[in-house]
Amino acid sequence: VSVTTVSIIINGKAEERKISAATQERVAEAMRDLGYQPNLSARRLRSQENERPVIAFFWPLDYRVSILASFLNFIQIEIAESGFDCEMMIQTYENDKLEQYGTTFLKNGYSGAIIGACSAKDQQWLEGICPRMPVILINRESEHFSTVCTDNDEVGLMAATKIRQKGYTEAAIFASRHSYFATSQRVQAFISSCERLGIETDEKYILKGSSTRNGGYEIGKQYAALKEPPKMIFCDSDAIALGALRAFHEEGISVPGDAELLSIGMLDPEAASYYVPSLSVVEMPNKEIGQQVLRLMRKKVLNNDISSEHVKVHAKLMLRESFS
């Protein structure tokens, strides 16, 4: 295969130049074997669409991927309403291994990058390479990059304050066994707020499992087996809370009669609203975060601005049947 033919195939003009499917497959196989990555910057310079910004959106491929759809939906709405004509490239990555995927997009020259739910290790690596493009972190703090985030201390205090107002002096905690950065910060903020407000959170009543409905179901079963556990329960995710509610139903634990649940709300609000009983949450403002991320990225890209800028959005307390 000639160099010219390879170039035509790489640049997506094989059909136009009537190059056979067999030849296209041979070139594709060679590219896979060599680990070849097309130079997107050069391609865009040759393209008639070189003025159209391309934004990379990185998100970890674990249980949190269910949250990605929510952010994408709100970002897409904001793109349409703002008229920002950009291309969004989605790249999932393994937690703590952003470097494995990140090197490629940094070399290929995207117009900007949105990084969601990165670990402390991933953030440290990213700050060490100083990419020359606008970078926005979701729900993280950084001096190097722009951020759009909620205040984890505010979230913890909001939950603890409402629990104390109802007269509770002790609370159980249902939490993820994996110490994901923002989640663990919110739990710690809740515990610290409880200490200040006179609410006991005994270690033996901090029950952990996977951050899924099944994990919550198993935690709910553990709680049901305890002798006289706290009636008040704080859950670090609505996935865990919904699973626990199923276990409570099977164990004959009435909510809110025998136990009350308040959770961090990360999923689609309808998931909590239409469950029986409906779930009370400190709702993370995914819609506002998505809107602010896109607005900030648009401003940075159009002004060729890589300086850091920080936007705070506020969580909301949504009281329903499980705790009011």
What are these regions (language model features)?
Residues 1-46:
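N-terminal helix-turn-helix DNA-binding module of bacterial transcription factors
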Residues 47-161, 165, 223-225, 239, ...:
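Alpha-helical recognition/docking segments in bacterial nutrient-uptake
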Residues 59-70, 88-96, 147-158, 174-221, ...:
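Hinge/beta->alpha junction and helix N-cap segments in small-molecule ligand-binding domains
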Residues 221-324:
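Flexible loop/turn connectors
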Residues 111, 168-170, 229-231:
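Short acidic/polar active-site loop segments enriched in Thr and Asp
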Residues 31, 79, 194, 248, ...:
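Conserved hydrophobic residues forming the short capping helix/wall of the S-adenosyl-L-methionine
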Residues 3-7, 46-63, 170-177:
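Short beta-strand segments enriched in small/hydrophobic residues
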